[in-house]
């Protein structure tokens, strides 16, 4: 699966903890992230991450473009709900696109853990259908 990882500044440490805790699951998948988040994940875990611009510089939009092409299967976006974000319209657009294309989306640690564990259990087989992959092939 192709998994997007995004975290606002005050949630980056949470993302590090999440990716460290679930490194063995995440290493089996393609990871994508906004700039600083991706760098911090790689530094902390050694996981390879395709990095885009930082969120305020267009990284959220770059990931949104992949969602619009159905090239992302799951999004973990640890948002800071208590701090105004200068790129809030980009954040809203990314969440909207996830809904439009039925991309599983977590915006907090509890849901992120459930989604990652579900990935390991094969709970997102519908994404294989979206991509035209036959799991028995």
From Swiss-Prot:
SMART domains: MGS. PANTHER family: METHYLGLYOXAL SYNTHASE (PTHR30492:SF0). It comes from Bacillus licheniformis (strain ATCC 14580 / DSM 13 / JCM 2505 / CCUG 7422 / NBRC 12200 / NCIMB 9375 / NCTC 10341 / NRRL NRS-1264 / Gibson 46). CDD domains: MGS (cd01422). This is Methylglyoxal synthase. Residues 1-137 form the MGS-like domain. The gene is mgsA. Keywords: Lyase. It catalyses: dihydroxyacetone phosphate = methylglyoxal + phosphate. The active site is at residue 60.
């Amino acid at each position: 699966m192709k998994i997007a990882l995004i975290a606002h500044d005050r949630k980056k440490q949470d993302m590090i903890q999440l990716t460290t805790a679930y490194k063995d699951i995440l290493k089996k998948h393609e990871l994508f992230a906004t700039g600083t988040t991706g760098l911090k994940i790689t530094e902390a875990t050694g996981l390879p991450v395709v990095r885009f611009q930082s969120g305020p510089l267009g990284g959220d939009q770059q990931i949104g473009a992949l969602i619009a092409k159905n090239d992302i299967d799951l999004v973990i976006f640890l948002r800071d709900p208590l701090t105004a974000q200068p790129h809030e319209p980009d954040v809203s657009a990314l969440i909207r696109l996830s809904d439009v294309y039925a991309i599983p989306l977590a915006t907090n640690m509890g849901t992120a853990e459930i989604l990652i564990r579900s990935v390991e259990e094969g709970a997102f087989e519908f994404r294989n259908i979206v991509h035209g992959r036959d799991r028995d092939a």
